[in-house]
Amino acid sequence: DEGKNNYLMSVVCMSDRYGISAADITTGDCYVTEVDKERKLLDEINKFSPAEIICNDAFFMSGIDMEDLRHRLHISVSALDSWYFGDEMCHQTLQEHFKVSSLEGLGLKDYEIGIIAAGAMFRYLLETQKNALVHMNKVTPYTTEKYMVIDSSSRRNLELVETLREKQK
């Protein structure tokens, strides 16, 4: 859809927490967060409405309804090989991409699982995109507690994303 963000989301399930990174490679927008409940994860998925989710195997085994994501929300979901989610590799991928010696300056100090999600996503993008990712020059960490969550039904009824009749923005 022209004029609509086209997000790729990376989800990592680890230690009963979820690391989330979402990026739109056309605009360069990139976000990182962590949540501790399935409901909050689903809220984030609904908020970004990604075209694709890449994830680790633990996410597939976490009990999330993959068929619901695939069919009702029309999201492609695929698990990547475990090496994508290696802690050291993810840190290194982000440090090289953003040309920093530490991720602290990017505001990611308190987002260990989010760093893994973002690192795996950037590694995946580097391997699958024909173009350089130079326009993706910042990452925005955020906490869900600082924002009011509007569920998908309310978002649709309030026509925040598109109109109900014409499906226009």
Across the structure, where does each feature detected by a protein language model lie?
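Charged catalytic and DNA/RNA-contacting regions of genome-maintenance
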Residues: D1-K169
